[in-house]
Amino acid sequence: DEVIGGKKVKRKHEPGAVEKATMWGPAVAIARSTVEEKLGKVPLSPYLALDLIAAAKSGSKEAAFRREDDAIEELIASDQFRASIYAFNLVQKHAKKPSGAPDKALARKVSKVGVLGAGLMASQFALLFLRRLEVPVVITDVSQERIDKGIEYITSELDKLVEKGRLSQDNRNRYVGNLSGSLDYAAFADCDWVIEAVFEELKIKQEVFAKIEEVVSEECILATNTSSLSVDAMAKSLKHPGRLVGFHFFNPVAVMPLVEVVRAEKSSDEAVATAMEVATNLRKTAVITSDSAGFVVNRLLGYLLGEAMRAVDEGASFEEVASAIAPLGLPMNPFDLLELVGLKVGAHVLDSMHAFNKERFYASENLHKLAEHGKLLERDAKGKIKSYDKKAMEIVAGGKNARSAAEIFESVQVGLAKEVKLMLEEKVVQTPQDIDLCMIMGAAWPFHLGGITPYLDRSGASEKAFGGSFHEPMIIGVRD
């Protein structure tokens, strides 16, 4: 209150003249390095703030206020300000009125949930359903040992929440009481919603769905968490294919806010409406997509990761490719992302997208070799990334046709613009806003860039790709 009222406040640890003279600059430099490490060089506002702090070391209060006014004026006129408003409206408004959503009244009541699988992903689902839907949840797997391990994981996670004060002991006990596991599919007979999280192989998913359909009611909705397989192909094993819908979470399940709800060719309005209602009750943002390879997020990330590996295979180093793509402003570079999702998973995604279209999507044999090696990054004792693994660099060495950073970056930008345009033409989603929402909520596309389509317009990639733009007028700041 005193600061707002204009009074000078005595600070206990206010730096003196000596400290200001000797430590101010280094402190700002450390802060700048930290911001660059965490956010990259693309965001405008944190660096302007640091410039103001650096300049505040000396001079009058009036001069400092003028600098602040100039900085605010620069920010308000910037592309990033307009893009941030667009992104904010996407998340706050567009997300609440999803394109193509059926009437909410068609959604069926979910009073019991079944989870097919008890691995890490499946256990995360079960935990989320227990806490958000507050209904009984039953899990199954191929062995009692795996079921027990899944239940142990869920229980331990609940215990951690109690220890942190985020969950009462009574609620913890209630959730544990609602959790069960069984090898017998008969335990799923009274489920209203069953979701699978089994091995990412079509035949296996078809088999478990065919078995579960024998015991559940005709009203029960079936959902698949597949990230790359055809929901239509899975539905072929069902007597009632209309009950199946895609329900693609992102990892970690509790943190990532997006769910891609996949409407297959025969998915009923009731199934889609129920999926949308379940997503809402889970406090997730749901976007409806068609049954197309990779849906939205994995299709675009699959393209990006493929192009990154293509550049490495051609002869560029990991560092050179990461640096070339850094202006996209993504929270992590392609190789950090590959290690995060798992090298085997990454190779599988690239293979799946390559099978979808061999001309547009690149599959890397070197990525399979890296997956066999099992390591891409070198970390220190605290887990912080230090460099790239020496053996990994040896595995990918040998390319003789390395492109420049500018060539790599332009190729990625234009390729992404072409892919987004195709997705809209194929009706994977209905609007560019749907794609932007998916990338912001599912791939952590930076808010200050406003989503992928405004960025591609501003960068000129849309014009190069198809001679136009995704938005008219473009989402840009004030121009002189």
Place the predicted regions along the sequence by residue:
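N-terminal glycine-rich phosphate-binding loop for ADP-containing cofactors
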Residues: 1-480
